[in-house]
Amino acid sequence: ASDVYKRQLLKRPALNTESLFDTVRSIIDKVRAEGDKAVLEYEATFDKVTLSSLAVTPEEIRVAETLVSDKLKAAISLAKQNIETFHSAQRFVGKKVETMNGVTCWQKAVGIEKVGLYIPGGTAPLFSTVLMLAVPAKIAGCKEIILCTPPDKEGNIHPAILFAAQLAGVSKIFKAGGVQAIAAMAYGTESVPKVYKIFGPGNQYVTAAKQLVSLRDVAIDMPAGPSEVEVLADASANPAFVAADLLSQAEHGVDSQAMLITTSEKLQTEVMAEVERQLAELPRREIASRSLENSKLILVRNIDEALELTNAYAPEHLIVETENYMEVAERVTNAGSVFLGALTPESAGDYASGTNHTLPTNGYAKAYSGVSLDSFIRKITFQEILPEGIKTIGPAIEEMAANEHLDAHKNAVTIRLKAINK
């Protein structure tokens, strides 16, 4: 197949945030100018809720805890523990390196002091995302972890979101959604502290808002688009499992994309039948069936061709259900998170295995990693130069600076060499 055809085949549904920029910019500007007042007004307009204040009270958190079932509390606690275990293993230990005699360099990892987490409202309460963002932030040593999430029409936040936030160590929770929440965290209001970096998924308005505030005022985790999965399978795959994986992606939202790349025509046919059968039983079948319109089933000649397409597509989630899946996995170079073998559904990583589910979409997996402990830290470099060190590297610095016509740079070394050579 030609490269042009392959590109067409892997084309994603277009996400156009440009057209939203004017609307989004005007909301950001108003929040920046008017603070809480503007946020409360937008909550009334967009979330149809009249709030007297934005902050969630300790009493609300206490009540929420009583409303979450013991079974769900136990599940959330198990997930938290696994996310903690996996992200703690990512801790950076910087060792001192003597690059030359008398020249020592090292790095120190420091948590970003203030981070803002955005948890969307929408059609599902994403308490799992609270864990995915707050747990690594806590391990990283972020001093202030604030969370914004839209309330329902009664002004309440889903109890599981409050429970997960409390469990994971969030410092402050605010009732604010959409663009107004992103603006509040980017610029600060009377209630909401200004943060240094904003994390979390959202619709195209939230994505556009994150893009705009990141241009000059605050860092963001990564550009985000609709969620996506690719299943790479051969004849050994279980068609019911593959169909279940495609549907679990499709129920996220109407713009989600699910794709099957397989070497087996028989599997392709069986998966199509299974998708129909399972879809009929899903409560969110309306959303899932609309999202399946963006989906593709691609038949390839061999695993090499499957991998070529996979690495060109760079899926957010990649499920490898083949006979020798470890060998296939070794050859994956572009993907957000990879799920190996018949018993590893994407849902495991979405919730409780320990890996992070905040991942690059829209082909960004070619250049971006998913959220990890590193997302919440900065590495500061240090260096110390002793007399024998400046004597050794000084002449090289002088020579380089002179050739770049930066005489003051050269002089900063010369003046020191003179002083120690007296």
Specify the residue positions occupied by each region the protein language model found.
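N-terminal Rossmann NAD(P)-binding subdomain characteristic of aldehyde/semialdehyde dehydrogenases
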Residues: V49-L126
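Short, small-residue-biased leader/transition segments that mark boundaries at the very start
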Residues: A1-Y5
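Conserved NAD(P)+-binding/catalytic subdomain of aldehyde/semialdehyde dehydrogenases
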Residues: G169-Q257
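C-terminal core of ALDH-fold dehydrogenases
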Residues: A312-K422
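A glycine- and small/hydrophobic-rich beta-loop-beta segment
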Residues: H252, L260-A335
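Conserved small-residue-rich beta-alpha loop and adjacent elements
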Residues: V97-F163
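Long amphipathic alpha-helical segments
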Residues: A14-V63
